Amino acid sequence: MVRERTKKLRGGHYGRGFKAGRGKGKKGGSGNAGMGKHKWIWMVKYDPLHFGGKGFTSHHISQVEVPINLGDVEYMYESLKRDGFVREENGEIIVDLRAAGYDKLLGNGNFTVKSTIIIDKATEKAISKLSAIGSKIENDGSSA
């Protein structure tokens, strides 16, 4: 009975080298060996960030403004009141948008409630619309 070629080559090292044909084939190194050489194409295709990221990293904290329109304040007025961001002091209505998490008041839409609005920044359009109905804007304790 003659052994087949594969069986003959399994133990020796002439036909396929020492370890080839024993189950794992010819690996070309284990793990990440050869990523910069013979496994380069695999790395570029399946692991493009293998040697590190690309581009620049921003190391400063970016401050993102959270804006709100006058029309949105009008629309959300009841929910702001329910959540405690609208209060009444000395007969004057105060809307604290800074405490509600907003940084800038934009002038799109209409606001009809005469009140004092507390916010850090406001556009000229928002200020003119509010002053037309007799409202004020306060930022850092000073009126705008």
Swiss-Prot record:
Extract the GO molecular function terms from the UniProt entry: rRNA binding; structural constituent of ribosome
Statement: the UniProt record of this protein carries the keyword Methyltransferase: no
Subunit description: Part of the 50S ribosomal subunit.
Chain segments carrying region Disordered: 1-32
Query: Which keywords does UniProt give here?
Result: Ribonucleoprotein, Ribosomal protein, RNA-binding, rRNA-binding
What are the record's GO terms for cellular component?
A: cytosolic large ribosomal subunit
Concerning PANTHER family, the annotation shows:
60S RIBOSOMAL PROTEIN L27A, LARGE RIBOSOMAL SUBUNIT PROTEIN UL15
Species of the source: Thermoplasma acidophilum (strain ATCC 25905 / DSM 1728 / JCM 9062 / NBRC 15155 / AMRC-C165)
User: What is the protein's given name?
Assistant: Large ribosomal subunit protein uL15
Q: Which spans does this entry mark as compositional bias, Basic residues?
A: 1-13
Give one GO biological process term.
Answer: translation
Family, similarity comment: Belongs to the universal ribosomal protein uL15 family.
Q: What does this protein do?
A: Binds to the 23S rRNA.
Which residue positions does the secretion signal occupy?
Answer: none
